[in-house]
Amino acid sequence: MELSRCRVELGTCPQHSKRFLKALTKEKLLEAKHSGPRLCIDLSMTQHMSKKELSRLAGQIRRLYGSNRKASRPFWICLTGFSTASPLYEECLRMNDGFSAYLLDVTEEDCFSVFPLETLVYLTPDSEHPLEDIDQSTVYVIGGLVDESIQKKVTFQKARDYSVKTARLPIQEYMIRRQNEKNYHSEILAINQVFDILSTYFETRNWPEALKKGVSPGKGYILQNSAE
């Protein structure tokens, strides 16, 4: 298949069709599996979630995967702590067309067993360390939680238990709190929002642009140089 040649002249390639674009997307995803970077969604904390929470998480997984497929530089995604007999898996099948054919890894094992601990960086808003860059040899871990089920420092403590490095998105470094009626400010984001930030930064190397992509106005933050 002459995907590489056609990619150079994508606008004029005679194979520029849905079938070709699907094959090109598959090629990019498989390249990411071998060259990185890798993103792990830790789904080992879903056993106490309600049906509503599981549905929200399944929807976030769908949006995350969809964004990754469209990315010019995709990540390779691994869903860990994820049993095919779990209610979340059933919800993913119900809500997400073609879920069983998603190009990603699925394992029941915990992320701390799947990957060498020294390669992991667990992303948690409770970390003291801002994420400065994305390293293609690193596995970035996002806790598979939703807003309604979040308990403070759960993911941070889990990473500490395994002596794994942690980092937080650099919201405090590039954004400021915006006054609002409810005085509400939160750095807790949905997993697809976290991914949108990581993906945008990986493509642009621009944190303000990336944060603007994933931190919605409802979180109570705006970029430092934004007009009030």
Language model regions located:
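RNA substrate-binding interface of SAM-dependent RNA methyltransferases
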Residues: 1-129, 181
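C-terminal folded domains that constitute the principal catalytic or ligand-binding module
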Residues: 137-228
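Intrinsically disordered, low-complexity regulatory regions enriched in Ser/Pro/Gly/Thr
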Residues: 31-34, 69-71, 113-116, 132-135, ...
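Broad hydrophobic/π-residue packing in well-ordered secondary structure
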Residues: 61, 120-121, 126-131, 139-140, ...
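Eukaryotic short linear interaction motifs
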Residues: 48-50, 85-87, 129-132, 148-151, ...
